[in-house]
A protein has these predicted regions:
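The Walker A/P-loop phosphate-binding site
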Residues: 2-113, 122-130
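A conditional alpha-helix N-cap/helix-loop micro-motif detector
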Residues: 35-39, 67, 118, 160, ...
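Short coil/turn segments at beta-strand junctions that form active-site/ligand-binding loops
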Residues: 84, 133, 183
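Short amphipathic alpha-helices and their capping/turn segments at secondary-structure boundaries
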Residues: 124-137, 174
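Conserved P-loop NTPase nucleotide-binding/switch module
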Residues: 136-183, 187-195
Length: 195
C-alpha cells in the first residue's frame, strides 16, 4: 500500500496538509462523539446517537413524534452538558414550551427563535453554532423554511425552486461551521403525499 501513502503524501503536499487522508491498519480512526437521542433503540440505530459536528435530518409523517424526539434529545443533552445551551428554530410556531418543560427541558438553558422567513432562520442557526455556547440545535421544520422573496411576492409569482436554492445555500453555509463545532444540528422534515 505504499502507492496509497505516496498519493496521499503528494496530494497533501500540493493542496495542504489534511486535504486527503487514508485510514490503513497503522492509522488511528477518528472517533466521532455522539449525543443521545433519548431513545436506546434510536441511539443504537444511529451508532450511539446524534453525531457531534454533523447535520442531521429527521424525517417522518406529520405528527409522528419528530419534535418530541428532538425535545427528548435536548433534555438528554442538557443533563450531560450543564454548561451548554440548546435551541430550537421554531419555524412552524408550534413548539409547546410548557409541555417541554413538563417533560424535563430546563428552560433556563433553552433558546427559541420563531423567524418569519427561511433566510433569517438559517442566519440565526449559523450565529448560534458559531457562538460556541449552543450544543444542540433543532430547526423545525424544513417544510416551513419559506424564502423571503416568496413571502413578499404575489400568489401568482413564479417561485419555483426558491426553497430548494435556500436549502442548498444553507447546507453550503452550515456544513463547514457545524463540522468545526461541538454542535449537533437537526433539521426536521416531513413526507408529503401530494405536491
Amino acid at each position: 500500500f505504499s502507492d496509497v501513502d505516496e498519493l496521499v503524501s503528494s496530494l497533501n503536499k500540493e493542496l495542504g496538509e489534511g486535504s486527503i487522508m487514508n485510514f490503513g491498519d497503522d492509522k488511528p480512526i477518528i472517533s466521532i462523539p455522539r449525543e443521545s437521542t433519548g431513545s436506546l433503540v434510536v441511539d443504537k440505530a444511529l451508532g450511539g446517537g446524534w453525531a457531534v459536528g454533523r447535520i442531521h435530518e429527521l424525517v417522518g409523517m406529520e405528527s409522528c413524534g419528530k419534535t418530541m424526539m428532538c425535545t427528548l434529545s435536548m433534555i438528554e443533552f442538557q443533563k450531560k452538558h450543564p454548561d451548554k445551551l440548546v435551541a430550537i428554530i421554531d419555524v412552524e410556531n408550534a413548539f409547546d414550551i410548557e409541555y417541554a418543560r413538563k417533560m424535563g427541558l430546563d428552560i433556563n438553558r433553552f433558546l427559541i427563535s420563531q423567524p418569519s422567513y427561511g433566510e433569517l432562520a438559517i442566519d440565526i442557526t449559523a450565529k448560534l453554532v458559531e457562538s460556541g455556547r449552543v450544543g444542540f440545535i433543532v430547526v423545525d421544520s424544513v417544510a416551513n423554511l419559506v424564502p423571503k422573496k416568496e413571502i413578499e411576492g404575489d400568489m401568482e409569482d413564479s417561485n419555483m425552486g426558491l426553497q430548494a436554492r435556500l436549502m442548498s445555500k444553507a447546507m453550503r453555509v452550515l456544513t463547514g461551521i457545524v463540522n468545526k463545532s461541538d454542535c449537533v444540528l437537526v433539521f426536521i422534515n416531513q413526507y408529503r403525499e401530494k405536491i
